[in-house]
Each structure stands twice: as structure tokens, then as C-alpha cells.
């Protein structure tokens, strides 16, 4: 996948990068750095009237030139937290999220739903109204739904999953399930782009890191390359240390 000279007015200055199938790309940066703007621009949810320029190429398909309904064949996008717009139970919500032409009675669909429900631990919530869920429960439903849209066995055209701060409403245990779900989607061959404010999670889970500051691409590459003490101190304007715990590197901000 190639992102070529994507920009959004003065909120996001032109930037380009590319990533391979199955890569997990984490977008990091301070509040207001342009993370959500970048993700929504890649997802095609911003119009040209909002100053969007550039292209997103997926296997030579120019994603942003397609109508939104056609874009949804190739990519799924989870924006930041929203409340349910209507009252259905969790199972119905998941059924509504299936790719066009797929039905819950199909064995392949049932297997995919079982797997994603297991990954985010929704087994006991399937017949509960979405209006009765806590914030963390609703976020897990949203995650399951967006993943079913591009679940590779149900949608062979799917290429890209975009998640904007998906861990924000989740507790520690639920966040663990989220990262397992992201690993599952990447293992299916999708590019997964995630905005995340937890820099230690970014460091531990990313194949590539894209570091933004004030709408400008500061660095792009492996976590070790991008998340250097020098880069992080420059962007976040706070002292940073790297320490090892049981052989695993961690960042400490002081």
C-alpha cells in the first residue's frame, strides 16, 4: 500500500509512506499532531472541500477516487468512541457489519463471528442491547464489527484496517484482547494502521511507527529507529529514558 503526498489543508502537511501486507503501522504523536486527521484522510471520510489532497494506492486501486460504498470493500475504519445510534442487540449489530452478500447462516460466517467474539470476549453479551453496554463493552462490539467487515475469509478484497485510538475506552485486560485482535487481522494479510497514545504499547507491537508533530511527519520506520530518545524528547518535549525489564524495552517519561 502506498500513501502518496496525502495532506489536509494546514492540519496535515504532505506526507508519503508505504507498507506491506500484514504490517502493523502505529501512528504516534502529541495531542493535536494530526493522527486522527491522517487516519480519516486515508479512510476517505474527509471531502475535498476539507482540503484533502493526495492518493491512497492499494494494489494499483486508487482508494480515494472510489465512492464510499466501494471503498468499504477494501478498507474498514473505526473512528474514536461513539455511542450507539439505534437500539439492537449485539448479535444483530455484528450481522449488520458483515460484508455485502454474506449471511449469518453460512458456516464461514459463523466461524468468523465465533472467532472475533472469542477474541474480544463477547460470548455472554450477544443478546444484550447495545444501549445497555458499558463504554468498554460497546468499544469491543465496535471492534468486532469493524473487523468482520474486512475479515479475509468473508471479504477476499479486504486490504486495510484503520483504528483510531481503539484502546482508549478499554481497561488493562480488554486492551490485551485488542492487541490479540490486531495481530489476528495482520496475520490474515491486512495492513493495520492504528493511532495510539500509549507509547510503550506502540514500541512493543508495531512493525512500523509513523511519528507526527504539528501535522508534520517527523519519522517513519521500525520502532527502534523512530522511537529513539532523541526523537521522543523532541516531539513530546519531556525527558525520556529507555529501560529494560525482563529483556523487554520500556519508555519512562519524567
Curated annotation (Swiss-Prot):
PROSITE patterns associated with the record: ABC_TRANSPORTER_2
Residues annotated for ATP binding in this entry: 29-36
Q: Which Pfam families match?
A: ABC_tran
Q: Localized where?
A: Cell inner membrane
Q: Which UniProt keywords apply?
A: ATP-binding, Cell inner membrane, Cell membrane, Membrane, Nucleotide-binding, Translocase, Transport
Function field: Part of the ABC transporter complex BtuCDF involved in vitamin B12 import. Responsible for energy coupling to the transport system.
Q: How does it assemble?
A: The complex is composed of two ATP-binding proteins (BtuD), two transmembrane proteins (BtuC) and a solute-binding protein (BtuF).
- What is the designated name of this protein? Vitamin B12 import ATP-binding protein BtuD
Q: Which organism is it from?
A: Vibrio vulnificus (strain YJ016)
Amino acid at each position: 500500500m502506498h500513501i502518496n503526498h496525502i495532506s489536509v489543508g494546514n492540519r496535515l502537511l504532505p506526507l508519503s509512506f508505504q507498507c506491506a501486507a500484514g504490517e502493523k503501522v502505529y501512528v504516534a504523536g502529541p495531542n493535536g499532531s494530526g493522527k486522527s486527521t491522517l487516519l480519516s484522510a486515508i479512510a476517505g471520510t474527509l471531502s475535498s472541500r476539507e482540503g484533502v489532497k493526495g492518493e491512497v494506492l492499494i494494489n494499483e486501486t486508487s482508494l480515494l477516487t472510489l465512492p464510499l460504498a466501494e471503498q468499504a470493500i477494501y478498507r474498514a475504519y473505526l473512528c474514536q468512541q461513539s455511542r450507539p445510534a439505534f437500539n439492537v442487540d449485539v448479535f444483530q449489530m455484528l450481522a449488520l457489519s458483515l460484508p455485502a452478500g454474506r449471511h449469518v447462516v453460512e458456516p464461514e460466517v459463523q466461524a468468523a463471528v465465533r472467532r472475533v467474539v472469542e477474541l474480544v470476549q463477547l460470548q455472554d453479551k450477544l443478546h444484550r442491547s447495545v444501549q445497555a453496554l458499558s463504554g468498554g463493552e460497546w468499544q469491543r462490539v465496535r471492534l468486532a464489527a469493524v473487523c468482520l467487515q474486512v475479515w479475509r475469509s468473508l471479504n477476499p478484497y479486504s486490504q486495510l484496517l484503520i483504528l483510531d485510538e481503539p484502546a482508549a475506552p478499554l481497561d488493562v485486560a480488554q486492551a490485551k484482547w485488542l492487541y490479540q485482535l490486531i495481530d489476528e487481522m495482520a496475520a490474515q494479510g491486512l495492513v493495520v494502521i492504528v493511532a495510539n497514545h500509549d507509547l510503550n504499547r506502540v514500541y512493543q507491537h508495531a512493525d512500523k511507527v509513523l511519528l507526527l508533530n504539528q501535522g508534520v511527519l517527523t519519522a517513519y520506520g521500525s520502532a527502534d529507529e523512530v522511537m529513539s530518545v532523541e526523537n521522543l524528547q523532541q516531539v513530546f518535549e519531556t525527558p525520556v529514558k529507555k529501560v529494560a525489564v525482563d529483556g523487554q524495552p520500556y519508555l519512562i517519561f519524567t
